[in-house]
Amino acid sequence: MATKDPTAVERANLLNMAKLSIKGLIESALSFGRTLDSDYPPLQQFFVVMEHCLKHGLKVRKSFLSYNKTIWGPLELVEKLYPEAEEIGASVRDLPGLKTPLGRARAWLRLALMQKKMADYLRCLIIQRDLLSEFYEYHALMMEEEGAVIVGLLVGLNVIDANLCVKGEDLDSQVGVIDFSMYLKNEEDIGNKERNVQIAAILDQKNYVEELNRQLNSTVSSLHSRVDSLEKSNTKLIEELAIAKNNIIKLQEENHQLRSENKLILMKTQQHLEVTKVDVETELQTYKHSRQGLDEMYNEARRQLRDESQLRQDVENELAVQVSMKHEIELAMKLLEKDIHEKQDTLIGLRQQLEEVKAINIEMYQKLQGSEDGLKEKNEIIARLEEKTNKITAAMRQLEQRLQQAEKAQMEAEDEDEKYLQECLSKSDSLQKQISQKEKQLVQLETDLKIEKEWRQTLQEDLQKEKDALSHLRNETQQIISLKKEFLNLQDENQQLKKIYHEQEQALQELGNKLSESKLKIEDIKEANKALQGLVWLKDKEATHCKLCEKEFSLSKRKHHCRNCGEIFCNACSDNELPLPSSPKPVRVCDSCHALLIQRCSSNLP
């Protein structure tokens, strides 16, 4: 018989132990049906077996004080090969209770199992055999095919959910000893397994009832909280409605106040307009009276000019008669020429004054064109005055033409006037008197023109005052327009508030309907909870006959639990599936519970 390699036998033993521990851990975890913690015995034995597998063939490292043989070195190498493992390494180093490398390695294995990536991490490590040769001997388990087989078996552990507390455990001082009694089967173990199965069934029933109660309590509490929140929102909406109604009342009062103020402002403006109209009419009447006085003065001036023209004609006739008195007439004519030159100067001054009057009238006409309809009569009066002034200028031009004709006649009659000089001397005195009278009349005309200028200045001041009053009235009208705009804005806001009020009333009605529906649902849930609290999960041993058809159970007629009432029925009487509050997936329900649940669902539907 050839002797076997002891290292190969060790690898085979460790591989078989790893298979048994992984298989037993998966089967026990699936039958246990809950997340595993650190006190679970199969899980503890799994970590012990993995520790032995990783320690097999590990090289011894020398230090100053002692020899060091630990698995933390190759596990720490995983961070460089697999970047996602950096988080585990950092968290292991940050743990406060770990002092030895072995404790860090044990914590690393537990964290890798919780992340369900232990197989991935160790696969990356096995592939890099040149790096592993620094830590392991050539005949080590991690360097041979058995290591790859163990890594493949570790993939099955991804089915398990584990919640391990690493901080509180003393991982440095634990002794890793494999308990072989867990993997050896006896008759007592078989009896214990049956007991464990019964205990597990009882625990499942208990957990099922507890979950039912917990879910029902949570639904009831959530519905209570919803009812409270809806009541609070209802009270808030009622308060907001009251506030909105108060705001609407205030806005209506402000609206009435603004309307009354608007009416008062309109009354005041109308009164002010009437007063201004009366003032304008009185001023126009005074203006008309003053214009009538001016017309009379202009008529008197025309009469005087006519008299002068007649006197000129008489003088011409007398000059024609008095040709013999030429020498005396020459002296008189020189005097007359001087007087004529003076009169021409005065006429030029009068022309300038008339031009000034024209310019003033034009300016007044342009200013009066910018005023409103109430000042049209003044513009017509000014137009009449301009026509009168034009007539006066035309008459003055005619007088100038006549004077020129008289001068020509005088030049022609110089030869004939020598005969009548003596007679003219006697009449020259009378002419001088007439000239002095005319000079007095000219002085009176100048004073009249000054009075007219002053009167025009007063008219301009009155017009300026009227313009100021018009601008003031325009400002008041603009204020009234702005008040109207504000009033319209307030009306729009009032309409918007009314819309919000109606929308809030509709929302309150909808909330009331929803509250009534939720109250009905709460009552249904309370009734269901009361009915479920009285139900008990019936044991298999207690039931020998079906509750509905009362047929005896046998090998062919199996027992089935109803997940709603907990009673036991045959397959024919419980061949129904419905989703329950305890489980979202459809579960087995008896015929009576099926009919009751369908009736309840149909009644809850709108």
Curated annotation (Swiss-Prot):
Coiled coil location: 210-534
Domain RUN, residue spans: 37-169
Molecular function as annotated in GO: SH3 domain binding; zinc ion binding
Presence of keyword Nucleus: yes
Top-level lineage group: Eukaryota
Residue positions binding Zn(2+) 1: 546, 549, 570, 573
Any Gene Ontology CC annotation: cytoplasm
SUPFAM superfamilies cross-referenced by the UniProt entry: FYVE/PHD zinc finger, RUN domain-like
Name the record gives this protein: RUN and FYVE domain-containing protein 2
Taxonomic path: Eukaryota, Metazoa, Chordata, Craniata, Vertebrata
